[in-house]
Amino acid sequence: MQEGKNIWSLILAAIRKELSEEEFYIWFENLYFIDATDENIKISAPNSFHKNQVEKRFAKRIKEILIEKGHNTINVEFINSPNDSKTHNMESKNISLKDISTQQDSPEKRTTFKIHTKNIIESTKQYTTKEEIHTKYRNPFLKKKYTFENFITGPNNKLAYNASLSIAKNPGKKYNPCLIYGGVGLGKTHLLQSIGNKTEELHKEFKILYVTAENFLNEFVESIKTNETKRFKKKYRYLDMLLLDDIHDLQKKEGIQEELFHTFNALYEDNKQMVFTCDRQPSELINFTDRLKSRFTRGLNVDISKPNFELRVAIIEKKAEEDGIKVPKSILNLVAKKVTTNIRDLEAAVTKLKAHIDLEDIEIDTSTVDKIIKEIIVYENDNTNTHNKINIESIKKVILRELKLTNKDIEGNSKKPEITKARHIYAYLLRNFTELSTIEIGKIIGGKTHSTVLYSINKIDKERNNDLEINNLIIELMNKINKK
């Protein structure tokens, strides 16, 4: 039995050197040693899909490793045994990735891995006799390139930065939960990942998990399909820190919202840190349960806005320095003046500057900058979804034509029911087809307040669920807007 465990450990150590952290985590984290004879090692997989995929991807390589290590007669057999997988927890004497003791080719070289959680893998290294690796909790989806040190601060993001750094130093103490909100490409993910990396550095025993809302949803759906919801709950409710990116992607998805609600409560009651990001304030989320929105507002909600000119210049200068670009400061200032959208676009502009310099061997002037800006705009349009391609004027024209209204009607203060309803619909469509905030939408619709616009959006959202006629009208208007 022990010899079989040692051989399986040897296989794991060899394979992990050949795979990325993410791949190793996905395919081997939930495999468990069950039993062994002189000729056969049995490994438990959580479900038939996982078993089949591991066999398809790695059976040949595992056999090669066995031959390389002098175990020609031994076979590794994978078994679909979810019950065995569930019972092999951290206290189990059976071997898994949580307790790997890998025997190398000679007794003088032994590597012992002590991995204390299921979600975390650390790179394999060679150690001399009796050396131990006390691995920390390592999230394979945390990217080391995101740090507080390389996050450039300014008036638009200083509060979010300070709060994030404070959370990393003292998780679960002050700002719990914390929600960072703002538009696309402004640095929300950078801060979220920086929190994870700094916390990992300062609190090595912490179980930290960074996950996008999309992956959180997909994992939840898969757990239902494979009857593994208990495993899913255990994974997320026994963390020290949950970093959930882009929660707006969970709008209109009631099942996962319910699961997140209970996960939130479990972590909150245990004083475990939670940080979320969103492209809008919680109050502006559509088809999102009120009780979950109220949970987000329990702690700190902090926004990141578009960078001002000085910050844009600083971002561009740093990117130019990293890329080894030498151009006059006047050119960098010109880029900062023209690209006012977000950090992502600023960095894209610098990348294109470098391409023009390297490939065309030309001096950058104002006409080149203008050309680059146009390329960025085209690129963004080509890669955004249909909603973002729709401009405000297109939406307005459809509303006026189909509802037989005038500019004065839609932007005025008439209390006529049909005109009031049209303004509600206009606000709703602007929110769904653009990235405008409620304040920006309010300015378009005759200077309405944030609360008025939010009321309009929520009203139409609810009516679509209860009124078939309204729902059909909205669908018809959306189809016409998409054709513009």
From Swiss-Prot:
Supply the Pfam families for this chain: Bac_DnaA (PF00308), Bac_DnaA_C (PF08299), DnaA_N (PF11638)
Output the GO biological process annotations, alphabetical, semicolon-separated. Answer: DNA replication initiation; regulation of DNA replication
Segments carrying the region annotation (Domain IV, binds dsDNA) are 358-484
UniProt keywords, alphabetically: ATP-binding, Cytoplasm, DNA replication, DNA-binding, Lipid-binding, Nucleotide-binding
Residues annotated as region Domain II? 73-140
Q: Does the keyword ATP-binding apply?
A: yes
- According to the UniProt record, where is the region Domain I, interacts with DnaA modulators? 1-73
Q: Which residues are ATP-binding?
A: G185, G187, K188, T189
Gene Ontology terms: cellular component = cytoplasm; plasma membrane
- HAMAP family in the record: DnaA_bact
Job of this protein: Plays an essential role in the initiation and regulation of chromosomal replication. ATP-DnaA binds to the origin of replication (oriC) to initiate formation of the DNA replication initiation complex once per cell cycle. Binds the DnaA box (a 9 base pair repeat at the origin) and separates the double-stranded (ds)DNA. Forms a right-handed helical filament on oriC DNA; dsDNA binds to the exterior of the filament while single-stranded (ss)DNA is stabiized in the filament's interior.
User: What free text does the record give on domains?
Assistant: Domain I is involved in oligomerization and binding regulators, domain II is flexibile and of varying length in different bacteria, domain III forms the AAA+ region, while domain IV binds dsDNA.
Name the UniProt record assigns to this protein: Chromosomal replication initiator protein DnaA
What is the species listed in this Swiss-Prot or TrEMBL entry? Borrelia hermsii (strain HS1 / DAH)
